[in-house]
Amino acid sequence: MSERGNRKTQIGVVVSDKMDKTVVVKVDRLIKHSVYNKYIKRSAKYKAHDVDNSCKTGDRVLIVETRPMSKDKRWKVRQIIERNA
């Protein structure tokens, strides 16, 4: 499967798997405060397409940007990096 261009990728943790073929992935990132020079953790939640319904809550996954699949869903699960034990 060839891909066009360089698509954005994110690594995050699945926080919800209650929807059919969709998971909610929480992605954390660190930003540096401009005045205090302290690193602050920021997080964002993305809805991602899970074709096989194979992701479970707590799994660490790699998501890749894709075409819009619905109103909120613009990411697709590429691989499960680590299963929740």
From Swiss-Prot:
What NCBIfam families has UniProt attached to this entry? PRK05610.1 (NF004123), uS17_bact (TIGR03635)
Question: Might you report a single GO cellular component term?
Answer: cytosolic small ribosomal subunit
The source's domain of life comes to Bacteria
- Single GO MF annotation: structural constituent of ribosome
User: What is said about its interaction partners and assembly?
Assistant: Part of the 30S ribosomal subunit.
Q: Which UniProt keywords apply?
A: Ribonucleoprotein, Ribosomal protein, RNA-binding, rRNA-binding
Q: What is this protein called?
A: Small ribosomal subunit protein uS17
Name the Gene3D superfamilies on file.
Nucleic acid-binding proteins
Q: Which CDD domains match?
A: Ribosomal_uS17 (cd00364)
The record's similarity note reads: Belongs to the universal ribosomal protein uS17 family.
- Organism for this UniProt entry: Geotalea daltonii (strain DSM 22248 / JCM 15807 / FRC-32)
A single Gene Ontology biological process assigned to it is: translation
Q: Which gene encodes it?
A: rpsQ
Question: Where exactly are the transmembrane stretches of this chain?
Answer: none
Query: Is rRNA processing tagged as a keyword?
Result: no
* InterPro entries linked: NA-bd_OB-fold (IPR012340), Ribosomal_uS17 (IPR000266), Ribosomal_uS17_bact/chlr (IPR019984)
- Name the job this protein performs: One of the primary rRNA binding proteins, it binds specifically to the 5'-end of 16S ribosomal RNA.
